[in-house]
Structures are given as structure tokens and as C-alpha cells.
A protein has these predicted regions:
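A short glycine-rich, Lys/Arg-flanked "PGG" loop and its adjoining helix->strand segment in the class I
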Residues: 101-115
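Glycine-rich SAM-binding Motif I of class I
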Residues: 34-38
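Short conserved loop adjoining the S-adenosyl-L-methionine
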Residues: 76-82
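Conserved alpha-helix/loop element of class I SAM-dependent methyltransferases that forms part
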Residues: 7-23
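Class I SAM-dependent methyltransferase SAM/SAH-binding core
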Residues: 39-76
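Conserved class I S-adenosyl-L-methionine
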Residues: 24-32, 116-123
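A short SAM/SAH-binding and catalytic strip from SAM-dependent methyltransferases
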Residues: 87-98
Length: 123
């Protein structure tokens, strides 16, 4: 059952959130300001972690009380152990990767399930 968010969340992020099981371990790669991760922690009680390239995004995420580190998905995903997370999310980030196939390989290695979304520039 889907509940309305307690704070604003983009429509595409709500759709991703609906795919995540309550109480699961989640890694949000390219988490930006942490909006999705904050929602998942608050509404689905996930154990959430984030990886974000932008110092401003890390600051915003940490300010929300989230466990987010600064890192580059093209380089830093190799450091994560196999099956460390139930869900690995890569939202609106794949198109910015220098090595997208390597990043996707790490996603399916790190998580039991991977959720990948890309922006629709036509909208």
C-alpha cells in the first residue's frame, strides 16, 4: 500500500520508492540532496546509505541526517562487498557515467536488486 509522502518527492522518485521493500538495506548512488533516501528511511524504515559526487549534495544529505559519503561511482563502487545491499538505486545518474557498463556490473554485484532510471529529456 502506498501512502502519500510526508514531504515533497518527485513523481519518478515515488515510483522508485514503491519498488523498495520496507526494512531493506539500500544504497542510493548519485543520491543528490538525499530526498529519495530520506523518504525511504522515514516511510519504509530502510537502512539507507548514499554515495554522491557533489560536495553540496553530500552536505544537503548529511544535513537531513543521512549516511552519505562523497564518492565517484565510476571509481568507488569496486570498494563495496558483494551483496551488501538489498537494493541499489541509480536514478538519473547512468547517463553521466564514464564507464556505464562497469557501473551496472557493480550494481548487480553489490545489491540483490538494482533499480536504474534515466531522465526523459523529451518531457
Amino acid at each position: 500500500m502506498t501512502h502519500p509522502p510526508t514531504f515533497p518527492l518527485r513523481q519518478d522518485l515515488r515510483r522508485i520508492a514503491d519498488l523498495v521493500t520496507a526494512g531493506s538495506r539500500v544504497l542510493d548512488i548519485g543520491c543528490g540532496d538525499g530526498a529519495l533516501l530520506a523518504y525511504l528511511v522515514a516511510e519504509k524504515q530502510v537502512i539507507g546509505r548514499g554515495l554522491e559526487l557533489s560536495p553540496a549534495g553530500v552536505h544537503d544529505s548529511v544535513s537531513r541526517g543521512l549516511s552519505v559519503i562523497q564518492g565517484d561511482a565510476d571509481q568507488d563502487l569496486a570498494d563495496y562487498p558483494d551483496l551488501a545491499f538489498d537494493f541499489v538505486i541509480l536514478s538519473r545518474t547512468l547517463q553521466a557515467m564514464r564507464q556505464p557498463l562497469d557501473v551496472l556490473r557493480h550494481l548487480v554485484r553489490i545489491g540483490q536488486r538494482a533499480i536504474v532510471s534515466i531522465p526523459n529529456f523529451g518531457l
